[in-house]
Design a protein with these regions (language model features):
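S-adenosylmethionine
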Residues: 1-195
Length: 195
């Protein structure tokens, strides 16, 4: 199984207050959040957003089946900065960014055939726009988690450098969990703290 990025983080014990105000800003199906919910023992106050209403509808079904009732879903396009947040600042932001999906290609090798380097650049630009619009909503001592299922440096390490240089967040850990040799998906995670 994959180590969940939320579980490996050493939170500064003094600075943490529960329930942890959390924003999953590219929620899609909410899987990452459900794991975070378990790890943090439900001590979490959650906002979830996605660019598509349909993704949030699926997420509501999944949350309902899992017995998760207390959350605030909303539609937001993070490639722009004109979205409204109920909570101005969060202690934890999870950004499972849209990506090329190159970490899943062991299942669909034909993707490689259609793929162009230009697409990597387009995704990287989109990822930078998304993190640039999410990070300003992180509290001091807050944790920002960046996740992709890509194996490309442009979508991973280069975005990490962008976050460090532009927002001066401190990188706590960064890991590419390689799955392709095990016929599983690869996943990249990076965790930052705003000091």
């Amino acid at each position: 199984g994959i180590q969940h990025p939320v579980s490996g983080i050493q939170y500064p014990a003094s600075g943490i207050q529960y329930p942890l105000s959390t924003w999953d800003c590219c929620a899609v199906s909410g899987g990452k959040y459900m794991t975070a919910y378990d790890i943090l023992d439900g001590r979490i106050q959650l906002s979830v957003s996605d660019i598509r209403e349909s993704s949030l509808a699926n997420l509501k079904k999944r949350f309902s089946a899992a017995g998760i009732k207390n959350y605030h879903p909303f539609v937001a396009d993070l490639q722009t900065s004109n979205f409204k947040l109920q909570t101005p600042n969060f202690q934890l932001i999870i950004c499972d960014a849209p990506c090329t999906g190159s970490g899943t290609w062991s299942r669909t090798p034909e993707q490689l055939y259609f793929f162009t380097g230009k697409m990597t650049g387009e995704y990287a630009n989109r990822q930078m726009q998304i993190v640039a619009n999410a990070i300003p909503h992180l509290q001091k001592d807050g944790i920002f988690i960046y996740i992709t299922c890509s194996v490309f440096k442009k979508e991973n390490e280069e975005v990490v450098n962008f976050i460090k240089e532009k927002f001066h967040l401190r990188l706590l850990q960064m890991e590419l969990l390689k799955g392709y040799d095990k016929k599983a998906d690869s996943m990249f995670t990076a965790a930052f703290i705003k000091e």
